[in-house]
From Swiss-Prot:
This is Ion-translocating oxidoreductase complex subunit A. It is a multi-pass membrane protein. It comes from Shewanella sediminis (strain HAW-EB3). Its main location: membrane. The complex is composed of six subunits: RnfA, RnfB, RnfC, RnfD, RnfE and RnfG. Keywords: Cell inner membrane, Cell membrane, Electron transport, Membrane, Translocase, Transmembrane, Transmembrane helix, Transport. Belongs to the NqrDE/RnfAE family. It is found in: Cell inner membrane. The lineage of its organism: Bacteria, Pseudomonadati, Pseudomonadota, Gammaproteobacteria, Alteromonadales. Its EC number is 7.-.-.-. It is an enzyme of class 7 (translocase).
Length: 192
């Protein structure tokens, strides 16, 4: 049980997919200007990332490995992710039309979010079992959500701040992301 907790903590804080592995930077920079959009994107990504992790594990274990189709792994994972994202998009559209409009193009872009595919592929390369795959996917999603929401809150404050002209917009956002990454480096010794 403790190894599962360590896997979750290390995935969320120590090996954060955005700040350490630099995966998922497109939605990180694109959706983080408003807190409401960031929270919606976080919920959608958490659902997609966790479900895609589990389904990718099942496809790999029960379809690709028995039939020796390992060379189709990346393509099949992309297909699994696309199906999960389409399902999520339909679910969000039915349950919250305002969130669906707020997320706009970023919801279908979860399909091309490299963090989702990265987690699925890392689950296989690190030889996680079913439970570890689910925890790893959920931890990656929680880490992504944590960073996205924190960064979004900081960007909203920066929009109201008196930032020098050359640093406005993307420049101050990149500086803030770098400082945030340095802050997360403090968790490095937390899990061995």
């Amino acid at each position: 049980m403790s190894e599962y907790l360590l896997l979750l903590i290390s995935t969320v804080l120590v090996n954060n997919f955005v700040l350490v592995k630099f995966l998922g930077l497109c939605p990180f920079m694109g959706v983080s200007s408003k807190l409401e959009s960031a929270i919606g994107m976080s919920m959608a990504t958490t659902f997609v990332l966790t479900l895609a992790s589990v389904l990718s594990y099942l496809v790999n274990q029960y379809l690709l490995l028995p039939f020796e189709l390992g060379y189709l792994r990346t393509m099949s994972f992309i297909l699994v992710i696309a199906v999960v994202v389409q399902f999520t998009e339909m679910l969000v559209q039915k349950t919250s039309a305002s969130l669906y409009r707020a997320l706009g193009i970023y919801l279908p872009l979860i399909t091309t979010n490299c963090a989702v595919l990265g987690v699925a592929l890392l689950n296989i390369s690190e030889k996680h079992n079913f439970i570890e795959s689910a925890i790893y996917g959920f931890g990656a999603a929680v880490g992504f959500s944590l960073v996205l929401i924190l960064f979004s809150a900081m960007r909203e404050r920066l929009a109201a701040a008196d930032v020098p002209l050359p640093f406005r917009g993307g420049a101050i956002a990149m500086i803030t992301a770098g400082l945030m990454s340095l802050a997360f480096m403090g968790f490095t010794g937390l899990v061995k």
